[in-house]
Amino acid sequence: MTIDIITLTAKQYAALSAEQLDKVRAAQLKKEHLRIYKRELADMAKIGLPSGLQGSLFSISNVLVQSAINGFGQSVMAANTIASQYDNLTYQAMYGISLSSTVFVSQNYGAKKFDRVKKSAYTALGLTTVIGLVLGGLLALLARPLCSFITDSEEVVGYAHTRMLIISITYFLCGLQEVFAYCLRGLGKSMTAMFVVLGGTCLFRILWLNTVLKAWNTLTSLYLLYPASWLLTTLIFVPIYFVCQKKAGKLLEENN
């Protein structure tokens, strides 16, 4: 009896092994399949290249802004570094939401579930706003004690406090800007998102440095550059996104 059970078990194991081997053979890598697929490459480049170019050009405006900050002295430079570390906590929380919105929007768009496309975008916008306002508000409220953990200089703490009062409270605008950009990429409009960010953020900041900051050369006017650029970019994104979303919905209806 025991021998029969062992024999039956061995046969079942052999059958399962053969089945798994068939699956492996079906998924095996063949030399003739190792080639460039033009359509897939074009789709990846259409989405990836604008994002990469945007990041590169964005760095140029950041260098110019950092140069302007450095012009206010060592204490301001130190304060900016400290405040940036705390603001990065808010940014990373919002960035996670905005990045995931691309996945949800693109997958539901590909699955032709347009209601979920809209729900994904609206949920991401709502979550980002709440996270940005709550975390940003807390950081602005606790700016002085938080910065005191890092430095004993009252001057540096004061400069950091000034920055966080202006930027931390309005950081949710940066999150909204990111969500709109990533949702547009999810709809296949990566180039559109790139041009909006480059114009509303990068170009605007360069113009601000050469006009507003030169007329009012104060730390406050320099830091106001950030919320002003986020607000402008978000306001540009709003009509563009909803027009693109509406067109995407009509396209899905026509193809059904």
Regions found by a protein language model. Name each.
Residues 79-143, 174-197:
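Small-residue-rich hydrophobic transmembrane alpha-helices
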Residues 56-89, 107, 145-154, 213-216:
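Helix-terminus/linker motif at the lipid-water interface of multi-pass membrane proteins
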Residues 57, 61, 97-101, 138-142, ...:
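Residue-level signal for transmembrane alpha-helical positions in Major Facilitator Superfamily
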Residues 11-49, 105-170, 212-256:
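Short alpha-helical transmembrane segments in multi-pass integral membrane proteins
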Residues 33-64, 69, 89, 93, ...:
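Hydrophobic faces of transmembrane alpha-helices in multi-pass small-molecule transporters and flippases
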Residues 51, 55, 63, 67, ...:
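Transmembrane alpha-helix boundary and packing residues in multipass membrane permease domains
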Residues 66, 95, 139, 182, ...:
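Structural signal for membrane-spanning alpha-helices in multi-pass inner-membrane proteins
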Residues 87, 131, 199-204, 229-233:
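Transmembrane alpha-helical core residues of multi-pass small-molecule transporters
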